[in-house]
């Protein structure tokens, strides 16, 4: 029998103190892919989150021929991609890609450096009908030849005759926007991306690529223009703070009635989530690079209505922890998931703990307040796992959340950081 890695949470402890917010997962992953576009120099990325998705990305980078150093204690990555020239290594193997959805972010580098790419599987969070077709349609619009085998075992991309073109995203996906910008950066001619994402992470990736020599304009407007250049050069860059990490810690502080200072957090990056949390009774104070979050435990949380939408709207990645927080509010909360279907997996787990949540299609009705009780729950995906741990912080008794891997994909040293704030959280291996 193999080892199970899980989180064990004992509730009843308010969070107090100081926590450091990690670098942004959704910025560093495309930056690792973009670093492979550099034919000169060594890329240095700082403020890198020590998470499983970063480790998978670096495994892929090494697999295709890059030299990689991950200095975890310093949260720094060094990537030398000057040796990416063997077309036989232009493969993203299922052994890694099936566990790591961000593997699609490596296709632009393989297209430009090796002339082709093959992806044998995609992984990450299981979110309903979410798929990657729009990435491949974008590559094809730039002149790539994209073919899929009959049994969907892998996808082949050939890039012999790339040229700039006009691209349109049906939904303003941050991953899709970043990927198409990377594909366009070394493609001859002018590429225009309409309905592009506005997320802060996209702007950080654009800044990174611009430092490398890419010619990109229109970031933050939804209409991005890329003038192809002949080469990109490696640079040093500090990754922005993770706004989802910020939101999760803010909600955990609110749930426990705590008072926490989040170092490196940026309140503006929360978008609508900031206003929704304030409506519930959460207080924010930004002083320089420190965001103070507090909630009076003697004042009940107010119920909320929230609809997920692209930035600056309410982030879909914060919807599961918001659901957990809403179980504590006095009254009915209504949450509509407008980005991904199948993202209410946490509802069943919270109901096991004593919550009263009804799911009707893409809408959840949370009847609060509920007294939560610890039990064994499943982390169906990364954000579901974070929401379950959050519920465990306020539940009576002990909550077991597994597999830990899902949470580890997106939150670095989660148990350590929570324990430093007074929580009783342990990440453990059991037979």
UniProtKB/Swiss-Prot annotation:
What EC number(s) has UniProt assigned to this enzyme?
Answer: 2.5.1.7
Please list the residues that bind phosphoenolpyruvate.
Answer: 25-26
Catalysed reaction per UniProt? phosphoenolpyruvate + UDP-N-acetyl-alpha-D-glucosamine = UDP-N-acetyl-3-O-(1-carboxyvinyl)-alpha-D-glucosamine + phosphate
Question: What keywords is this UniProt entry annotated with?
Answer: Cell cycle, Cell division, Cell shape, Cell wall biogenesis/degradation, Cytoplasm, Peptidoglycan synthesis, Pyruvate, Transferase
Q: Which InterPro entries match?
A: Enolpyruvate_Tfrase_dom, Enolpyruvate_Tfrase_sf, MurA_subfamily, RNA3'P_cycl/enolpyr_Trfase_a/b, UDP_GlcNAc_COvinyl_MurA
Spans through the membrane:
none
- Origin species, per record, is Thermobifida fusca (strain YX)
Which cysteine residues pair off into disulfide bonds? none
Q: Which Gene Ontology terms cover its molecular function?
A: UDP-N-acetylglucosamine 1-carboxyvinyltransferase activity
Tell me which residues bear 2-(S-cysteinyl)pyruvic acid O-phosphothioketal. 125
What is the similarity comment for this entry? Belongs to the EPSP synthase family. MurA subfamily.
CDD domains given for it? UdpNAET
List the Pfam families hit by this protein, alphabetically.
EPSP_synthase
> What name does UniProt use for this protein?
UDP-N-acetylglucosamine 1-carboxyvinyltransferase
The record's Gene Ontology biological-process terms are:
cell division; cell wall organization; peptidoglycan biosynthetic process; regulation of cell shape; UDP-N-acetylgalactosamine biosynthetic process
Q: Which HAMAP family match?
A: MurA
Protein location: Cytoplasm
* Chief location category: cytoplasm
Single GO cellular component term: cytoplasm
